[in-house]
Each structure stands twice: as C-alpha cells, then as structure tokens.
Amino acid sequence: MAHAAQMGLQDATSPIMEELISFHDHALMIIFLISFLVLYALFLTLTTKLTNTNITDAQEMETVWTILPAIILVLIALPSLRILYLTDEINDPSFTIKAIGHQWYWAYEYTDYGGLIFNSYMLPPLFLEPGDLRLLEVDNRVVLPIEAPVRMMITSQDVLHSWTVPSLGLKTDAIPGRLNQTTFTATRPGVYYGQCSEICGANHSFMPIVLELIPLKIFEMGPVFTL
C-alpha cells in the first residue's frame, strides 16, 4: 500500500501492474531525455553570442523537428497500446465477482459460490483496532484467491463510482445501468487497499476497498466466506 513520502508507485501484485510500472519507467526515461535536450538547447541559445540574420529557411532543421517527435510518439504509443490490449483481454476466468457501488459503500456478490451477497462499509474510527488503517478498513473484506484469473463485474446503483486497487493496476468505472468488467491474476497473498476514484458525493472519500488475497487451496475450503 502507499505510505507517507512515497516517491514511486505501489509494489505490483499482478502482471498488469508490472507492465504499467515498466511503461511508467519507459515514458519517464523519454521525458527525461526530452527535458535534457530542451535545457541543452536553451543553454546554447543563452550562452552563444553569434547570430546569423541571413537565414531565411532551414529545411534540414524543420525535417528533424518534425520526424523526431513522430518517432518519440510512436515509442510511447506502441507499449501503451499493448497494455490497453492486455487489460481488455479476458481468458476463461476461474471466478466471477460482482461489485456494486452505492452512496457510500460497496456491495459484492459471489455468484459462483451460492450467490453470497454482502455489503462493505468503512469502519468508523471508534471501531478500529491497534494497527488498523484510518479511512481504509472495512467491516467485510473481499476474499479472493491468488494465481487464479478473477473477473470483476462492476456497476453502480445510483451515481458514478470507480472501483480502484492500485497494487493490482485496476481502475474500472461503475456506471448506473451498465456492467463493466475487468480481470486480474494476483501473484502474492496479502491485504490490499483501494478507494472509489470517482467523485460521487459528500462521502466519496469514505468508500474504501479491501482485498484479502489468499492461496487457492485455502480459498476453496469455504470458511473464508463467513461474515
């Protein structure tokens, strides 16, 4: 999860997030090189006293500053399109979970396990235990297996919401009357936090998402669904 004074992204817990971190580093390197080139050109402009007032055109220079940005855009677009394709790819998910946004809590349905339905509310500060995280803990966590493809079906009962878990690289809008879907495969067990990422009213900041990822064998035993 995120912590104070954090400089980078959260640690990846899914292949998609690993791809996003790699793309972030790739784009950051290109931005750094562009910034260095611009600063170098400005430095030369400010320190060089020679001028030539007879230049009317510069075909070579215009060709360079037209082709070079096009190449840079292609270098950014190609890996971005690849990640977009991967996020939309759904390959025979093992489990399907439905998340429904409400003002201001989440409801979940385990349709593959007897139609289990429960609500997930943020825990008020008075109910927090030592070590719990303020504004991030919930009364009922979403328990899911690792190393198994999970499909999330996401919608809303009232206004626009957004189901977001940064460690998994997930951010899917919850839209009333529409069912969006996304898939992920978690690679590490643990507890991971997210929040609604679409301003949805007065208590928008109090819609945390908590995923508890456990080994598949433990998940299939069943008692994890006891609320």
Curated annotation (Swiss-Prot):
Where is this chain primarily localised? mitochondrion
State the top-level EC class.
translocase
Q: Which residues lie toward the Mitochondrial matrix compartment?
A: 46-59
Task: Name the Gene Ontology biological process terms.
Answer: ATP synthesis coupled electron transport
The record's keywords, sorted A to Z, are: Copper, Electron transport, Magnesium, Membrane, Metal-binding, Mitochondrion, Mitochondrion inner membrane, Respiratory chain, Translocase, Transmembrane, Transmembrane helix, Transport
| Cofactor: how and how many bound | Binds a dinuclear copper A center per subunit.
Which portions of this protein are annotated as coiled-coil regions? none
According to the UniProt topology, which residue ranges lie Mitochondrial intermembrane?
1-14, 88-227
Q: Name one GO molecular function term.
A: cytochrome-c oxidase activity
Protein's membrane topology = Multi-pass membrane protein
- Cellular compartments per GO CC: mitochondrial inner membrane; mitochondrion; respiratory chain complex IV
Question: Which reaction(s) does the protein catalyse, per the Swiss-Prot or TrEMBL entry?
Answer: 4 Fe(II)-[cytochrome c] + O2 + 8 H(+)(in) = 4 Fe(III)-[cytochrome c] + 2 H2O + 4 H(+)(out)
Binding site residues for Cu cation A1 = 161, 196, 200, 207
Keyword hit for DNA damage: no
Q: What does this protein do?
A: Component of the cytochrome c oxidase, the last enzyme in the mitochondrial electron transport chain which drives oxidative phosphorylation. The respiratory chain contains 3 multisubunit complexes succinate dehydrogenase (complex II, CII), ubiquinol-cytochrome c oxidoreductase (cytochrome b-c1 complex, complex III, CIII) and cytochrome c oxidase (complex IV, CIV), that cooperate to transfer electrons derived from NADH and succinate to molecular oxygen, creating an electrochemical gradient over the inner membrane that drives transmembrane transport and the ATP synthase.
Q: What is this protein called?
A: Cytochrome c oxidase subunit 2
Organism, scientific name:
Symphalangus syndactylus (Siamang)
